[in-house]
């Protein structure tokens, strides 16, 4: 049952094949077995069981709230959840319990979804590995698949076997791992420069970033207001569309959301792609791109072409400036947003009371990690009076040029862009931490952050590499053409038969490992 899609398990609930409580208990059991992956910061067991019980009562009365009623979900720990700790994986917010739900969380709960818990991330969502949070790194479940372990057996000879585990990508790595291990059927992530698509690509799930303004940001603890978007992680594209249909629409609490009513996101079964024009940005063929990803990218383009679609090379001429532009704008907004964490209103406060200034400084030193403090310093530098015009204003102008590049390509007749999501497959943790967060983020966001600056929708379905690891390929659509984008991604997913089949195989491979780790965890506690 846990291996089914959201739509399938929803039908099973309606037909009485399983009850919401039984489903919730199965997921809770799996959360305990996979605890060593560190996907969850908080497991809301009591809340989940109570919500499942209420859902069960509705089903018995024949009053189901819809496709999400009784469905286990998870939420990244930078969305406010009423009565449940929301930490952003930071000492600054340890112990903070919001008095309200983020709009997207409330919408899911209003549809009867069952909240399993809050998922792990990089501190304040600043990172691309889910390795820099105060609760420790998230392990990629694919590290324990039979195929990967066999392929890397010779490399790990003489090493501690567990030192070879893979990163999940970030910053929504906990959400991606939670979906990949069947502990929930959908999860919320956030996406500022690729934080939903990157871990989705590494963990073998679907990661969807909606158009900016389509989904409310209210209650998402802000990183970069002009780029932040709630992201959706599911096991298949259809499930992402179901969740998007529940979340999309105007929110009076978020002035950036669309004013017009949003139609339901029902995806048609696309059988003929001959009328599609697929664009391949030539600037995305970088020297750093791995041969494995490049090969799969080429095969995907050939697949569309063989089915009659028009596949053309296009140019996004300002691509080479995008990562630098993103860094300036991102850190500038980070500096502004992080200013609210001063130890007075909520969150951590140090014991120093010599002066207000000393208390501020010590609180922020104790509350933020080096990555967050570094981005604050960079942002404040760019916002200095003598630097403002040369950095921040110039970056805003370049951002407009980058957005116009996409507009020009789509106006030329291109329906969807096809690009890699990441430069390579997931790498081992020990290799990942050899470089600093800033360097890694610049590498890992290279194909994803421009979409956030342009406000476009993007989705990352996946294929499987020769090494037995997921590789993400990104589809980018016109602003507010999310349904068309997901329809194309659904067609592609059907052709490559991924990820649901492979995820089931992953769980079959890993089940014995999970049981061993669970027993080891119990014996250590004893």
From Swiss-Prot:
Organism domain of life: Eukaryota
Gene3D superfamilies: Amidase signature (AS) domain
GO biological process terms held by the UniProt record: glutaminyl-tRNAGln biosynthesis via transamidation; mitochondrial translation
Catalytically driven reaction(s): L-glutamyl-tRNA(Gln) + L-glutamine + ATP + H2O = L-glutaminyl-tRNA(Gln) + L-glutamate + ADP + phosphate + H(+)
Localization in the cell: Mitochondrion
Record GO terms (molecular function): ATP binding; glutaminyl-tRNA synthase (glutamine-hydrolyzing) activity
GO cellular component: glutamyl-tRNA(Gln) amidotransferase complex; mitochondrion
E.C. no: 6.3.5.7
Residues of the active site: 76 (charge relay system), 171 (charge relay system), 195 (acyl-ester intermediate)
Pfam families: Amidase
InterPro entries: Amidase, Amidase_dom, AS_sf, GatA
Keywords: ATP-binding, Ligase, Mitochondrion, Nucleotide-binding, Protein biosynthesis
Assembly and binders: Subunit of the heterotrimeric GatCAB amidotransferase (AdT) complex, composed of A (QRSL1), B (GATB) and C (GATC) subunits.
Function per UniProt: Allows the formation of correctly charged Gln-tRNA(Gln) through the transamidation of misacylated Glu-tRNA(Gln) in the mitochondria. The reaction takes place in the presence of glutamine and ATP through an activated gamma-phospho-Glu-tRNA(Gln).
Family from the record: Belongs to the amidase family. GatA subfamily.
HAMAP family to which the protein is assigned, alphabetical: GatA
Identification of the protein by name: Glutamyl-tRNA(Gln) amidotransferase subunit A, mitochondrial
The organism of origin for this protein: Canis lupus familiaris
